Amino acid sequence: QSSGKYQPRVDQLVRIAPLIVEMGCFARVETNGGAFEQVNLLYGENPNKAVRAFTAPFREAGIQTHMLDRGLNALRMYPVPADVRRLMYKVKHAQGVDITRIFCGLNETRNIIPSIKYALEAGMIPQATLCITYSPVHTVEYYASIADRLIEAGAPEICLKDMAGIGRPGMLGQLVRTIKEKHPDVLIQYHGHSGPGLSMASILEVCE
């Protein structure tokens, strides 16, 4: 997301999409990382057309697509006005994106809840996010209470976003159990990073 040479052009996206479908093992496919469609712009491409071209094969195959967004900051690194965020979800939905993973690095629900409502208004699925870290403060109870507020605000899904891969497997497993006991119908998705070496154990714990 920070280096253009690692980002695909629209012609590459269109070529790879059918292969992802043929693999037969994905229910969801990411349409963007933590970046806006700057890469398309750098290539002189229209990002609106690029996203539509990439999502089309997945929609035909019944595979959902999802995006990442920073709540109050939308797809930027600084606050974005509410009317612009509201329009963003309508545009992304029209482009063929089904789910938006809404997060705030500080787990501040005031930065997330308005976006949940805007996404629902636009017909998207808002996946509210818990940014996972490891400290004496970041306990199962801490995260579960945030999940309660996000679900009460209308989020049908929760993402455990272990951005640095340092979430402890045992804690993550207990967190999933705690949320599921109270909200059995809420879908929980785990997002991990493999650098510190804990991610496979975390995957096993959250699945269990």
Short names for language-model regions:
Residues Q1-S2, A128-P136, P156-R168, I188, ...:
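Active-site-proximal beta-alpha loop/turn segments in soluble metabolic enzymes
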Residues S3, P169-P184, I188:
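Active-site/ligand-binding-proximal alpha/beta "capping" segment
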Residues P18, A27-D148, G165-R168:
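Active-site beta->alpha loop and helix N-cap motifs at the rims of alpha/beta catalytic domains
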Residues V21-E22, H93, I151, C207:
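Non-catalytic positions within long, well-ordered alpha-helices that form the structural scaffold/packing
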Residues G24-F26, V97-I99, A155, D185:
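A structural motif
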Residues E141-I146, L150, P196-C207:
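Catalytic cores of alpha/beta
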